């Protein structure tokens, strides 16, 4: 079920008007989609953050614009890196009966056996691409890694799909692995490599020249 979010049309697109919108606690946004003319709106910043936090990044939002509503997903957003405030948002109009491709967060659950033995859990990807109808898009994909030993890994092919969606990534792609712990021997090797003096280019030739001159 889509969560409701109120929006207001934006007619004045000047910088000064946009600044006033942000000062009032709202976020300038654009609504667009396949065969849809873009519409400029604004939404309450707190309401948008709360919606994404409570419902997830891929939540279906019923955007209420005046006397009409449209089903959308938050496609992109911009944040002020200094003030940590929302600057802009993009909403993509979705067709509830059509499949779409979206990135879904991957969460590793549990402590691996390998970590208890000093191993290190590696997660090369934090999102994977899936295909599904809007209502079937999972909020996240949870992978139980508690049985992994040192040297074990989980690939896309190992993920149990619990729902009506398809994973589009290469089945052989690794999404989690446990690497061996770093040993003292590894550290000693690193120290030797770091302390080794670099070989001078041409040093061998210089020595050969000196020997020739001394003959």
From Swiss-Prot:
Q: Which Gene3D superfamilies match?
A: Ribosomal protein L25, beta domain, Ribosomal Protein L25, Chain P
Annotated signal peptide: none
Biased composition range(s): Acidic residues: 183-197, 206-215
Q: Where is this region: Disordered?
A: 170-215
- State any single GO MF term: 5S rRNA binding
What InterPro entries does UniProt report for this protein, alphabetically? Rbsml_bL25/Gln-tRNA_synth_N (IPR020056), Ribosomal_bL25/Gln-tRNA_synth (IPR011035), Ribosomal_bL25_b-dom (IPR020057), Ribosomal_bL25_C (IPR037121), Ribosomal_bL25_long (IPR001021), Ribosomal_L25_dom (IPR029751), Ribosomal_uL5_bac-type (IPR020930)
- Gene Ontology BP annotations: translation
Q: Looking at the record's lineage, which domain of life comes first?
A: Bacteria
Instruction: Give any Pfam family that matches.
Output: Ribosomal_L25p
Query: What keywords tag this UniProt record?
Result: Ribonucleoprotein, Ribosomal protein, RNA-binding, rRNA-binding
Name a GO CC annotation attached to this entry.
cytosolic large ribosomal subunit
Family statement:
Belongs to the bacterial ribosomal protein bL25 family. CTC subfamily.
Its subunit composition reads:
Part of the 50S ribosomal subunit; part of the 5S rRNA/L5/L18/L25 subcomplex. Contacts the 5S rRNA. Binds to the 5S rRNA independently of L5 and L18.
Q: HAMAP family, alphabetically? A: Ribosomal_bL25_CTC (MF_01334)
Known role: This is one of the proteins that binds to the 5S RNA in the ribosome where it forms part of the central protuberance.
Which named protein is this? Large ribosomal subunit protein bL25
Q: What is the lineage of its organism?
A: Bacteria, Bacillati, Bacillota, Bacilli, Bacillales
Gene that this sequence comes from: rplY
